Amino acid sequence: MGKKVHNAKARQNPQTIVDNSAVKKIQIDVDAVAGGNQVGYDEANALVLPSEKRATKIKVDKVQHVKILSKKQRKHLQAIVDKKKKKEGRAQLLGDLAAVQIPEEELQQYTSISQVQTVGLKRLPTLDEYLAKKKERQAQVLAEKSSASGLRVNAIKGSKRKLLVEEEEELQAKRKNPNVISVEEDDEDSSSSDEDDEEAPAQSAPIAIPTPVSIAPPQIAVKPPIKKLKPEPNPPACIHQTVYVPVHRTTEVQNARLRLPILAEEQQVMETINENPIVIVAGETGSGKTTQLPQFLYEAGYAQHKMIGVTEPRRVAAIAMSKRVAHEMNLPESEVSYLIRFEGNVTPATRIKFMTDGVLLKEIETDFLLSKYSVIILDEAHERSVYTDILVGLLSRIVPLRHKRGQPLKLIIMSATLRVSDFTENTRLFKIPPPLLKVEARQFPVTIHFQKRTPDDYVAEAYRKTLKIHNKLPEGGILIFVTGQQEVNQLVRKLRRTFPYHHAPTKDVAKNGKVSEEEKEETIDDAASTVEDPKELEFDMKRVIRNIRKSKKKFLAQMALPKINLDDYKLPGDDTEADMHEQPDEDDEQEGLEEDNDDELGLEDESGMGSGQRQPLWVLPLYSLLSSEKQNRIFLPVPDGCRLCVVSTNVAETSLTIPHIKYVVDCGRQKTRLYDKLTGVSAFVVTYTSKASADQRAGRAGRISAGHCYRLYSSAVYNDCFEDFSQPDIQKKPVEDLMLQMRCMGIDRVVHFPFPSPPDQVQLQAAERRLIVLGALEVAKTENTDLPPAVTRLGHVISRFPVAPRFGKMLALSHQQNLLPYTVCLVAALSVQEVLIETGVQRDEDVAPGANRFHRKRQSWAASGNYQLLGDPMVLLRAVGAAEYAGSQGRLPEFCAANGLRQKAMSEVRKLRVQLTNEINLNVSDVELGVDPELKPPTDAQARFLRQILLAGMGDRVARKVPLADIADKEERRRLKYAYNCADMEEPAFLHVSSVLRQKAPEWVIYQEAYELQNGDSTKMFIRGITAIEPEWLLLYVPLLCNIREVREDPAPRFDKTSGKIFCHVDATFGKSGWELPLGEVEMPLSEKACCYFGMFLLDGEVCSRLADFRSKLKSTPASVIKSWSSMNNKVLRFKRALITKQIHNRQALIDQWNSDPHFLLEEYQNLLYDVALSELTPLWPPVDKKEPQRQ
């Protein structure tokens, strides 16, 4: 019991329960208790008390002592709890499994695993042989017994037969094992064996033996065939019928195809394409995906009824791939064709069509569902061009629409270094992630070599590295990556001078001292790619002849052979020994190639070998602006004894595969054109490439054998400064042309379009503002501000031209004053970049214009008057016209060389001119425009109109000269001599040094392009494509950017009867900077004052001629409507309010109101007249003359 606690009873704190049953029986009259506070009575303060003592009961709470469990009991209870939890989990699991179990009807259609052969396959022949022997022995025994059927069989003899039966039963049990099923067993065999078992007892009936008790072997229950349920009719699915279209290739082509990695994946690729509407194929360059995948689809029958479309981001790739595929398939070009911006060979018989992505986008505008195609292949998707991103977004919606209509369209996205996450993880683009196929490239291992330090002068470093490779490493082509055309030409010129190539005719020269004409032409052709100046070309020719004569003298001097001791020389080793000596391992080679010094830049100590002993280099340039003929030279065979060396921009990164390349020198940079999202200012900046691009460049060295890639930057720079992928073009460039095309296609909410990488919101807003300024979009004049701007009629016209929207507006406004031929030439020239060859230093403003040898001739093309004020576009106009005439005479190359024009650019200008001419003739019925080679220059008046048309298209690119009079500092005035303030820029911009208006420096100009250049540690802004304008034109052609401060009443506003509008003189400013504009006349903007002035002209009879007869009966003059005291006259006030309420400020608005309400203004006008009844005016109302136009 334990020790009793002191005062334990008091410590218990029991609960006393009082029996209140007697109190509850007492009846209380509540109303009789006057003023009683019933709420205040409780158990402690009762209202009444019973007469007798209440019974109480003490309740003591019993304290329950918790019994402590032992460890064994706790484990036992825990096991019970765990068992219960497992049972609960098992029930939940069984319930979940039952929920996803297939129906019983469907389950019966499957084959049980017990009916599938799984084990015992090797023992089947042995068992069959053993069973046959047993059956033979049994047959012999039965035959003997049948012959002596009258004899009684003793137990011993019967026991032998019993043993045989038992052995056979045991063997049959093994054969009937549900895990072992003979592949030859069928229903007939099983039924026959059952019959034999039934006949056996009948035959042994006379034999007096006890019937053996045997266990029947387990038999497989063969279920009768179940009729499959007919599936319910589903919507038309994409069921591809197996088709094979034979292709007769040559043996050589077939053998070459078999070496491509994608040929091994053909089965998997085609099965994936057949089963999925959208497929992504990722494979390194050289895997053969571009050339082989269209052939797979052709052989699978996708080109039987529709075409296979393949898009390429570059025109060169589209043409080259088309010809290559046609050659491999042994098909004519009429069936495997291409279509690019200016040319194509597509015919009605075309089955495979290669095109640029812009061409396919234009086809979607006319045929949204692409009903001509069965497959669309988007190649080079990793380059992420603007058109490719739009096509991916559009096709992601077109493919499901075609599937619903029962005309499935396959979409295949191909790329070398694909940003797979942009496609597979973008649920807004693809609701169901498309399958990804990775094709391994036919790639040899490439050893990557980094620099210890990253040099600043990467061109000089590339030159030194090339010398090391050429002098010390084995045979193999060299591919050098630099940033731009200037660096390509500089490096090509330097390498050609260091390792010159002497043609075969040099032997004849050594004999007779003469140079053949063929050698001269070939030498000139080699020098033309790098030396643009004819004087330099002539100097190079003379230098070549001089070197040949020197080599002749050296040859004669060496004819007297000296005595040579062969013991002083060591026999040369083979290539393998040279490889081992020069390339013991990666570290040694890196160290040997990196220990360069600046002395190697000198041409005397470059190689340490005589000019006659050095192996020549066949150095070729490659960049996008190079002519197609010179680009194709990289595919031609290299002359004997030469090593191929290609100096290229990033064109050779993915678009073209250059043969015989073993060494790659990667500078790690690229020239990127950056755009300001708000102002549109562009800047060419040399930046690091992405890691994906660097890997692409390195992969070029592993096409023919194991190669090496020498990266002219450190590994730390590669890890820290290189992005994984380049930023898509759609996020870097202005997108107004993209927005206008999409809006004309019916895509109003461009923000919600499923871009793989959507453009920035700032880009879209800036593009929308520019299109509104151009008049292509119009803000809705409703209270609902959420509606996007609507496309105007002008916007639809602009979208039909394959040029930028600003140039499209210029074409749309040129249908007057015979300006269309000149505008077409201007637009074609302005749309092609770098038409003019610029020489000399262009960044220094102190360089005189005469430093450019073409400047004087261009100054004569824009000599004076409006020709000069038209400025640089006038130079382009004269150049295009003269080049067209020279081309008709067959003298285009000579003309371009003599006048500083790029021949390739002039060819593109002519193609675009022809295309624009055809578009205009197609869309405008009353125009017969042609490309006239004898087009005369425009007149002075036409040149003035062309200035206005240029302003209409480039109204957001207006610049005003910096006022030098306000600058006191002479140095600052000298620095800002050619400086202009642009509308959206804070820093001043300078006129381009080659502009013909640089000396004149007009006060107001428009420019075609603003760009930024690095000038030392700072940057400097330049503008080019300059045209002078008059400031009063801004109010007329760019009204949305003008700010009207005040409407002038002197001179008084006037009403133009032709247009039905009011014109007035205003004080205005231009742009955000508030540049003052001279006094100009414009249409009076909508305001209460404009409505009052319109009412004055209406009462005066100028708006409607029928009301002129009532002018004498007016109670007050028409001018009283615009007076301030007119509000005191109720009748005049009602007339004014009626016009202001309906916003009637021109004749067309009044006519529209009368069309909806014919009695508008009838009562108000009648109140302003003397002695004119309402019945007299009603027949005349509305007072619109039938000859007056209903729509302006």
From Swiss-Prot:
Keywords: ATP-binding, Helicase, Hydrolase, Nucleotide-binding, Phosphoprotein, RNA-binding. A motif (DEAH box) lies at residues 379-382. Residues 170-214, 504-529, 567-612 are annotated as: Disordered. One of its GO terms (biological process) is maturation of SSU-rRNA from tricistronic rRNA transcript (SSU-rRNA, 5.8S rRNA, LSU-rRNA). Residues 270-436 form the Helicase ATP-binding domain. Residues 540-746 form the Helicase C-terminal domain. Residues 183-200, 584-607 have a biased composition (Acidic residues). SMART domains: DEXDc, HA2, HELICc. 'Kurz' means 'short' in German. It catalyses: ATP + H2O = ADP + phosphate + H(+). This is Probable ATP-dependent RNA helicase kurz. Its EC number is 3.6.4.13. The modification Phosphoserine is found at S529. GO terms for cellular component: nucleolus. The keyword Iron does not apply. InterPro entries: DEAD-box_helicase_OB_fold, DEAD/DEAH_box_helicase_dom, DHX37-like_C, DNA/RNA_helicase_DEAH_CS, Helicase-assoc_dom, Helicase_ATP-bd, Helicase_C-like, P-loop_NTPase. PANTHER family: ATP-DEPENDENT RNA HELICASE (PTHR18934), ATP-DEPENDENT RNA HELICASE DHX37-RELATED (PTHR18934:SF99). ATP binds at G283, E284, T285, G286, S287, G288, K289, T290. GO terms for molecular function: ATP binding; ATP hydrolysis activity; helicase activity; RNA binding; RNA helicase activity. Residues 505-517, 567-583 have a biased composition (Basic and acidic residues). The modification Phosphothreonine is found at T530. Belongs to the DEAD box helicase family. DEAH subfamily. It comes from the Eukaryota.
